[in-house]
Amino acid sequence: MYDATTPSDPPEPSGTPAYRTAGSYTLPEVCGRFVAASASRGRTAATAGAGVLTDMMQFTLRHTDTRTEARAGELATDHGVIRTPIFMPVGTAAAVKGIFHRDVRDEAGAEIILANTYHLYLRPGTKILEEAGGVHRFSTWEGPMLTDSGGFQVFSLADCRKLREEGCHFRSHIDGSKHLFTPESVIDTERAIGADIMMAFDECPPGDAPREYAAKSLALTERWLDRCFERYAQTQPRYGHYQALFPIVQGCGYPDLRARAAENVRQYDADGYAIGGLAVGEPTEVMYRMIEVVNAILPADRPRYLMGVGTPTNILEAIERGVDMFDCVMPTRNGRNGQLFTWEGTTFDRRYSKAYLHHLVTCGEMMAAQIASLHNIAFYLRLVRAAREHILAGDFKEWKEAAVAKLGRRL
């Protein structure tokens, strides 16, 4: 058994392995079943409930900056088109904390939100989500949605989880009940939730993990990834819209492990690719270097998603390095704690003075968290929209350098 409190010994297959060990497979072995299933899916459009499914998610690059790797594109889903670069507000339990969906969409301008498989699995559970017709109908969010697989949440539960080859045993943070996540069960759960973009199940090791731990953890993630895509190919969407599956690149702060992981995931010919395991304790310069290593290998014609990052400066630096999609709890979490992100002190909603906002925060009024959270999400979305405009205009580099200089100031 792999105990999270003893990170030197991740599990490895023993005897005759049920799943391939990392490095022992060839491209046809890893991808043959998935590629064949993908081709079949493309030839015969599956139907489920309301309509006919598209056979894949379409990503169109509109412009790539000539002096950086920054890109402007469009990602077409069955629930709408997402203009990239994009920030995805985090709605862990299918709700962005403290804000109405209409305000997230209409006031802040969100085009896609993120929910979490781990939390939705525990509450309300897949049975209720299935009876409701999926997370879109359940939550009344009509736009695109992405679900994280729960790998990071499992990483966060270090004191109450254990990893094995089959998957992850953990105790609920709610009531202490015992559960098991496997690559197969996570895909089944994400199918039941019904988000437009699903994430593969992975292990997210600490950013400063020793190399031996990082290598064994990556090998486990790669074996799990093969099982995720096999299950994905065996199942169909349930609610009449296409669901993409993004693999996740791990490897901590080791360039060779990151490169190996990127080479491995690109073999799946997925609709998009995610970079995980960053902003989890490693120095910022290491994070930027890992993004560069990975993006040099990932296909240029697919969206790249940097998971859980980050500050406004982090986002602009990552856009410069070729990242298209972001999520982070920082806008809402910091908003609930009275911190606002601004351009030189200007607030998003000018109906409220800064004096009044300060008053609400010091009084502990619920309205303070709501206004501040909406303001911060609007700030993040305006930031990535501005980045997109300057990429298209051809002056992204100059604008980004000036913006980063301003973003580092505290008012």
Cite the ranges covered by each PLM segment.
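Conserved, mostly hydrophobic/aromatic
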Residues: 80, 113, 148, 190, ...
